Amino acid sequence: MDYKTLTALKPSEYSDAANGFRAVSDMASAAKDRIDMQIIGAMKSANEGEAATAAEGQLQELAKNFHYTQAECGLISTALDGFAYDMGAAKRKLDAAVEDAHAKNFTVNSDGSVSYPSAGEKTDGKIPEGGTVTALIGDPAADAIGRQAARFNPNPNARYAQEYADRIADALKEATAADEKWAPKLRALKADDDLTVSDRDWVDVKKDTAGVLEGAEDYLHSIKELPKHGTPKENAQW
């Protein structure tokens, strides 16, 4: 995950997509329940014979498909919400660092480095020059030396620029970790190109569920409980 990509990323778009998959999951659930609880029962009461039995079997298979759609779309929704939650945290850190840099009239470059203007007391009649710094995240010893050098720089802007560059790099590191966590989980959420929901499909659902719930732990813990005695507006917001 690089600076330009995270800057352009909009976590809300993934949350919106999650809402769409959640709506499909809900519709599939409703369709499954209607087939199981209403249509099949009505058919049994009104029809008999081989044709009725065959039709009932087809409806049961259709209900299985709706059930599978409900489960898979629910998992995709949760995964997208988890991804948006993790990326949102990283994006807020990035935006805060960039905002602080801009407040000091620094320039954040396309690679995440930070350029700062000349400032400080004159030396030999000259104001200390500005410069550009990159993040000091890697070897602890080298990082410590770099930060110490920034503190002793006659230009006071150097220290602040180094701080902002490090914060930007921290945000990018967090976003990269989120991307690496969620990309394989989302790629795994795919169905076979057929209309038969097999035992193997349900084994995959169970496996996918475990992976998604593990990855979305922080997101799920962030969800507040339904307000007790909440108003209709509060319940809708929840």
What is each of the regions a protein language model found here?
Residues 201-238:
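Long, low-complexity, intrinsically disordered regions
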Residues 1-200, 204, 214:
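N-terminal secretion-targeting helices of virulence/extracellular proteins
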